[in-house]
Regions:
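Structural preference for beta-strand elements that scaffold enzyme active sites
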Residues: 33, 49-51, 101-105, 136-140, ...
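Helix C-cap/helix->beta junction micro-motif
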Residues: 130-133, 163, 219-220
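EAL-family c-di-GMP phosphodiesterase catalytic domain
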Residues: 1-17, 22-26, 43-46, 56-61, ...
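Alpha-helical scaffolding segments of alpha/beta enzyme cores, especially the outer helices
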Residues: 91, 118-125, 152-162, 180, ...
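PAS and related sensory helical modules
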Residues: 61-70
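Active-site and channel-lining beta-strand-loop segments
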Residues: 31-57
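Catalytic core of bacterial c-di-GMP phosphodiesterases, primarily the EAL and HD-GYP domains
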Residues: 79-152
Length: 303
């Protein structure tokens, strides 16, 4: 037998091990950094909570959230990544903390996977291990655009609510799909797609949509969050439209530590004299808000 054929037989018997994916090392070493961005109650200027934003190690190939997500999807490790990010955020948050709630992102597909009782125990265990009460946690449902397993998603969000968590629906647009999911999941927090709150002062149609969505939020008992609020004028517009909560660079940049007070420039805007909008009549009747939305669904920035 030749040496070549012997080597081939040995390779078949003991195949070479596949090298671990680089993301595996990131998760095993805990090489993740958490930043916290404040979410502000617009009527009072108080800190409602902070969204936890996770990054990879600085100057690494997986520094950005998108790079981490792309690597996780390629390696079929998205749930592992998201649970690791959640654990890291809870660990860094600490207990007790003086600045309200912590907002944690979980994709709709991961929540579907966690709807199985055995998997859900892993999620529940994170709150216990890091001593953060579930009542101080808001789970943001992200990446729900292409989801089809609505029953499993609803099972998981219902189980989280039973623990005491609040549910937030992220990246909501004035589209029929977003509104259907809103009414189905009944989240206590609705976070608008950032395109709906950017450059508001130059797009009056957006302010009309904000007012209509604010009415719908009132009727469903949800708090509406405007994201990407980047200047004083846009802050005034979202406040005057009746939006409850806001986040963005004008209100506070993501930082390694949570803050207990709003920055001075935003406090000055919110301290200006203004008249809060009247709430819509007949809470629970969605017809008026839905009628207004029908005229706006499908506009260019809501696809």
């Amino acid at each position: 037998m030749s040496d070549v054929s012997l080597v081939q037989r040995l390779l078949k018997r003991w195949p070479a091990k596949t090298p671990p994916h680089p993301l595996q090392a990131v998760l095993e070493q805990g090489a993740l950094e958490t930043l916290y961005q404040p979410i502000i109650a617009l009527q009072s200027g108080a800190i409602d909570g902070h969204e936890a934003l996770v990054r990879g190690q600085k100057d690494s190939d997986m520094e950005t959230p998108q790079a981490l997500l792309d690597a996780a999807q390629l390696a079929q490790m998205q749930m592992e990544l998201e649970l690791a990010c959640m654990g890291r955020a809870l660990q860094s948050w600490g207990y007790p903390h003086t600045a309200g709630r912590i907002y944690l992102n979980l994709s709709a597909h991961t929540l579907v996977a966690l709807s199985e009782p055995k998997s859900f125990k892993r999620l529940e265990g994170l709150f216990l291990v890091h001593r953060v009460p579930a009542k101080r946690v808001v789970v943001e449902v992200t990446q729900h655009r292409k989801l089809k397993e609505f029953n499993a998603l609803e099972r998981c969000t219902t189980a989280l609510q039973a623990l005491g968590c609040a549910i937030a629906l992220d990246d909501v647009k004035a589209s029929r799909r977003s509104l259907d999911l809103w009414l189905r999941l009944k989240p206590s927090v609705v976070k608008l797609d950032s395109r709906m709150t950017q450059d508001l002062q130059n797009d009056p149609d957006k302010a009309k949509v904000l007012r209509t969505l604010s009415n719908l939020a009132f009727k469903t008992g949800a708090s509406l969050v405007a994201k990407a609020v980047e200047d004083a004028e846009d802050l005034r517009i979202v406040r005057d439209a009746g939006v409850h909560l806001a986040q963005g660079h004008f209100l506070g940049f993501p930082a390694p530590a949570a803050v207990d007070t709003l920055n001075l420039r935003a406090r000055n805007v919110l301290a200006e004299k203004w008249t809060p909008p009247e709430p819509p009549s007949r809470p629970g009747d969605l017809s008026a808000a839905d009628s207004g939305l029908q005229k706006l669904v499908g506009m260019r920035w809501f696809d």
